[in-house]
Amino acid sequence: MACICNGLRGYKREGLEMRKESTLCYIEQDNKYLMLHRVVKKNDVNKDKWIGVGGHFEHGESPEECLLREVKEETGYTLTSWKYRGIVTFVYGEDVIEYMSLYTADAFTGVPIECDEGVLEWVEKDRIKELNLWEGDRIFFRLLDEREEFFSLKLVYNKSNVLEYAALDGIPMELFDVINPDGSKTGVVKERGVAHREGALHATVHTWIVRKNDKSGYDVLLQKRSLCKDSNPGSYDISSAGHVDAGDKILESALRELREELGIEATEDDLTEVGIHRGQFEAVFHG
């Protein structure tokens, strides 16, 4: 989530709603990001998480003024080259909204100082996914890695700090429940692209449609995959298949995929569970 709570700077009250404005920056050097491990304050929404550096706007500040001041205060560095990468809208529960300007920086001067918000550490970019991060932060790390253009990301968390909704440039993103080997839910929800990048175990549904005939016994309906698909393009495949979205059940997901892919309206009584298969393979997925 990377919400940055330091007193009441940058807060606006709209009725019972608390609105905040902040900046967050990931400073780059030698293929590493400067990460802040928030281990100092007891009552910290980011307690034990790893985030970038930044903070809330002071009165009258622009995003860039806030960025430069916060980086200087927390790291001792003066940024000399930075890029505005995106705006992240956080919604937390019913009463907290934060608008966070997200930056990366690749040049700076100055001598590092100790940070009273936590411990600063340079971390290899390919190790970032191993850190204790907010699930929404994993999404914008993916975006920072995969695209150059400015983006708008909306992240909604419930009061249990579980990601409930994400949208990129106004378009909802797919979220999956991460599951255990026995199929039970871990309580973690990941965005589709993040789940695929990290190899997180998640559920899919595969449905074969059959009908009786007078010759071989049964016909099986196959679907020829589009040539633009990431996996097995142009191949004949299962009648219908798809991911199980976060919060959805297996049967309702199977019925949804039948309807969306084939236009078939079915009921739970029309389906027979054959079994559970665990599969794993490596491929390049786009989203």
Question: Model-predicted segments: where are they?
Answer:
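Cysteine-centered motifs
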Residues: 3-5
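Residue-level signal for well-ordered, solvent-exposed loop/turn and beta-edge residues enriched
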Residues: 32, 83, 111, 162, ...
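Conserved Nudix-box catalytic region and its N-terminal flanking loop in Nudix hydrolases
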Residues: 33-73, 159, 163-171, 194-206, ...
